[in-house]
C-alpha cells in the first residue's frame, strides 16, 4: 500500500462541493437492496431466502427482533420511490434483483416466477421513463432457501451453475434496458460476517432449516437450526469454510460474466463490476515496518482477496503464503474466466481502522478469519479514536480514508475505472424524536460533503473514479440491526404506512447535485425548482 501520495493539483471546495466541480459525465445516484426495502415476502410468487428463514427462526439475533417481511414496502411503493429519485435529480438508482423472487426454487428447473419478472420490468421501465439510469446488482446476499436446503448454498460449488442460470435469465429479460451490472455485492462481507467465520450469527450460509411452508405462516423447526453446514469436511475450521464461500462467489461472478460476453455483449453492450467493501487500513505506528506490512496484509484480506484474482487469476501473495493449502487454487480454465472479468471496480467505503502486527495463533485448529492475517485492528490510538463514532458501534467517520483507499486501488490494482457504489453513515433510530427532529441529519450531511470532497481530490490526482452512489436512498431494514439504524437520505416513518420524507441531507444533495447543475461551478440550486424538498417543517407532506 502506498504511503506517499501526490500533492493535489487543484484546490477542493470542501463543504461547498457541488455537481459543477465534477465532469458532466460523472454519475450521482443512490442505492438500495431487495431484501432491505421490498417487503412483500409472501407476495407475487416470491420464494423464501436464507434471510427469511434466519430472521424467523432466530429473531433474538436481530437487534430489535424484526425481519424484512415488510421492510419498507417498496415492492408496492416503487413508483413513489422513483418519484423521489427524480425529484432529487439523481442520474442513477442502484437496486438488486431478489433471486428467490425470480426463481422461487432457486434453479431454472424449479420454475420461473413471471410475476417477479413483471415486477422488475415495471421497475426498470419506470426508471427509464423518468430519465434515471438503472444500476442492477444480481446478488445482494439473498440466497434462495431452496438452494441452502439442497446443498448448503455458497458452501457448495453446485451454486455456480445455478447463479449463472439466474444471471442469464436476468440478462435475457432485462439486459435490453439495463447496461450497468454489479454481479455480487461485498463478497468479503458475505463470506465473513454473514457466513461461518464467527461465533456470533447470522451464519446464513450454514442454515439448514425447514422451509417456509405456506404463504401466511413460517415453519419453526422443533430442533435448533444448524449453524455450521453439514457438508463441511471433518476437521476443517470455520475460517476454511469462509474461504470456500469466497472461492465459489468468485467462480459465480466469472460464470455470469462469461455467459454475458458469450451471448449478450455484442447486442446489449453492458458493463460489469463487483461491489467490493473497503476500509482504510492505517498502520498503528507508521514508523514501524511491521505495522505497515500488517496494514497491507489487512487490505489484502479485505479487498485484494476478491480483486487480485480478477487481475492475475490468483489470490494475493500474502494470503497464499499464510494460508497455504487451506486456500483453494483456481484451475487454468477458471483463471482464464476470472482474469479481466470486470469493466470497473465498485468500491463500498464507510470507515477506517488502525492496524498493527500480530503473532499467528499457536493452535492452527482454532484459526479464525481475523487471526489468519496476523494483524490486529483497533479504532483508537493512545486513547484517541481514529474518527468520531457515528453511533454506538463500528462506523468511525474518517473522510480521508476514502482518498487513501482510492489511491491504493489505482496504484496497486492496475488503475481501474472506479465507481463508489456505497458510501454513507447511519444514525440510531431514536423513537423519541419528532418527525421534524428526525429529519435533521447534520452528521450525514457533513459526512457526505467531506467524503465527496476527498473523492474529488483523488480525481484531481488521476484516480479514475466516475460515479458516486450514496448508501442509501431511504431508511431501510438493516440486516442484523433491523430497524434500529437509519442510513437513508429519505426518512421513512416505520409507524405510519412507511411514509417518506426528505432529510436535510436529501435537500442538500438535491440542491448541490441535481442533474440540471452540470454546467456552472458554485451554482446553488436547480434552474427549475418545484419546491418539493423545501416544504416547511410545520407542513411536512408525504411524497
UniProtKB/Swiss-Prot annotation:
GO terms for cellular component: cytosol. The keyword Cytoplasm applies. GO terms for molecular function: beta-glucosidase activity. Its EC number is 3.2.1.-. InterPro entries: Glyco_hydro_1 (IPR001360), Glyco_hydro_1_N_CS (IPR033132), Glycoside_hydrolase_SF (IPR017853). It is found in: Cytoplasm, Cytosol. The active site is at 186 (proton donor), 422 (nucleophile). Pathway: Alkaloid biosynthesis. Its main location: cytoplasm. PROSITE patterns: GLYCOSYL_HYDROL_F1_2. It comes from the Eukaryota. Keywords: Alkaloid metabolism, Cytoplasm, Glycosidase, Hydrolase. Pfam families: Glyco_hydro_1. It is an enzyme of class 3 (hydrolase). A beta-D-glucoside binds at residues 36, 140, 185-186, 350, 422, 471, 487. It catalyses: deacetylipecoside + H2O = deacetylipecoside aglycone + D-glucose; deacetylisoipecoside + H2O = deacetylisoipecoside aglycone + D-glucose. Beta-glucosidase catalyzing deglucosylation on N-deacetylisoipecoside and N-deacetylipecoside. PANTHER family: GLYCOSYL HYDROLASE, MYROSINASE 3-RELATED. Belongs to the glycosyl hydrolase 1 family. This is Ipecac alkaloid beta-glucosidase 2. The gene is GLU2.
